[in-house]
């Protein structure tokens, strides 16, 4: 989005509209080549995603070599795969920080998604609009569009 704002031309859809390409007339062509995987069914893509991720997760939980000695239900248990943490207390603190940062990132992405749904623009363009006219481009101004009877 930032590159497009500065004049670089991309043929791809805006990031928050990318999933809608599968519903277009031509479907979704990977790498712009219709001879590669030509996806036209959202159910087929969903099924492939479930099967592929299910196989990987099943391998991990079932005791694959990459998951040996780890608790299969604890997130972040493979936090230090290279063994760089010397102090167990510091490692435990860093694990908590990593999980909290991941939660913050997910919450931020949720904000970007809501912003894109409400305004139809990405976060960079919304930031530029807000900086240009803060009174007209903020959450309260857009919230008035959803007031019943307006």
From Swiss-Prot:
GO biological process: photosynthesis, light harvesting
PTM comment: Photoregulated by reversible phosphorylation of its threonine residues.
Chain residues that bind chlorophyll b 5: 49, 146
Keywords: Chlorophyll, Chloroplast, Chromophore, Magnesium, Membrane, Metal-binding, Phosphoprotein, Photosynthesis, Photosystem I, Photosystem II, Plastid, Thylakoid, Transmembrane, Transmembrane helix
Sites where the protein binds chlorophyll a 3: 21, 31, 98
Cofactor binding comment, as recorded: Binds at least 14 chlorophylls (8 Chl-a and 6 Chl-b) and carotenoids such as lutein and neoxanthin.
Protein name, entry field: Chlorophyll a-b binding protein type 2 member 2
Organism in which the protein naturally occurs: Pinus sylvestris
